[in-house]
Amino acid sequence: MQIKPPYLLFIGDATDKLSIKMAQSLADWRAELCVGELSVNGCTVSTGLNQCSICEAAKLGAKTFVLGFANSGGVLDKKWLPIISEAIENGMNIVSGLHDKLTNFDELVSLSQKHNTNLLDIRHPSTAFATGKGYKRKGKRLLTVGTDCSVGKMYTSLSLEKAMKEQNIDVDFRATGQCGILISGSGVAIDCVIADFISGAAESLSPDAEETHWDIIEGQGSLSHPAFAGVSLGLLHGSQPDALVICHALNRTHMRGLLHTSFPSIETTIELNIAAAKLTNPDVQVVGISVNTSSVSIEQGNEICERLSQTFGVPCVDPLRDGVDSIVANLC
């Protein structure tokens, strides 16, 4: 699947910053490939890119219109079809990371054929995967795992890959979600793989490699989240990680989207993930903690990270504020 830049990022009428993480990820990691963002009345969030209409984007050479939002259930609301159609009529390919397939909408299929554009449903793998086998693979693997969803697993993974490349370490980022796939250009949307084959898909994502090579595997969900723990567990087993980085966001009182649930501690998260990971790698270790401290001051964030580092005996950082060099040093 080839995704052609430049991109126009569509965030609709989003009011939740976390709901536009696909657009925000591109704005943060591939801003040079984006011509701007498009929102409509009622939208209260932004990626920080300039507002840009479809016509303006086409004049700037935009090749792909990215549906940069997500929602519970991954539904494509029909109210967006006229806007998507306008983008197609202006010669743009359409990229979606939603569960609802673009190709399920006959009017979009017909229009894209007429204008010789592509409908790219990047959340739907076309590859057939085997079941997981659990055989020991060569090379080294790190998996980011979280106390909850949307706590920075992808950002931490990308930060680690970038820092390791700057130190001339042989490393690859392995995307497991639609945002990561769009950023890296490859990967597997692991939450759309049939349950029996999740661990096998993860094995195929990080195959045998040189002994000094690191695969940084993007984590998904959380073992403590009732809705997504199954995906997290299959990914954990198939990734066969040598190292885990625990990702956490401050000041959450319940699991994302589930007001009736309690939020797990970092200690509980470590215990759950280590116990589960040992099924396919008995030597797995936690090598760092990544904390989103954006809800507190820099000084408070530093104090919290220092305290967590002392408590758990591994580096603790906010990747966006501190970088991840200390975790890389502990890893290598």
From Swiss-Prot:
Q: What induces it?
A: Expression is up-regulated in the presence of D-glutamate. Transcriptionally regulated by DgcR.
**Would I find Transcription regulation among this entry's keywords?**
no
What reaction gets catalysed by this protein? D-glutamate + acetyl-CoA = N-acetyl-D-glutamate + CoA + H(+); D-aspartate + acetyl-CoA = N-acetyl-D-aspartate + CoA + H(+); D-glutamine + acetyl-CoA = N-acetyl-D-glutamine + CoA + H(+)
Q: What is its EC number?
A: 2.3.1.312
Pathway assigned in UniProt: Amino-acid degradation
Q: What does this protein do?
A: N-acetyltransferase involved in a deamination-independent D-glutamate degradation pathway, named the DgcN-DgcA pathway. Catalyzes the transfer of the acetyl moiety from acetyl-CoA to D-glutamate to generate N-acetyl-D-glutamate. Can also acetylate D-aspartate and D-glutamine, with lower efficiency. Has low activity with D-asparagine. Cannot use succinyl-CoA.
Report the PANTHER family cross-referenced here: DUF1611 DOMAIN-CONTAINING PROTEIN, GLL3100 PROTEIN
What protein name applies here? D-glutamate N-acetyltransferase
Per the UniProt record, the source organism is Pseudoalteromonas sp
What is the gene called? dgcN
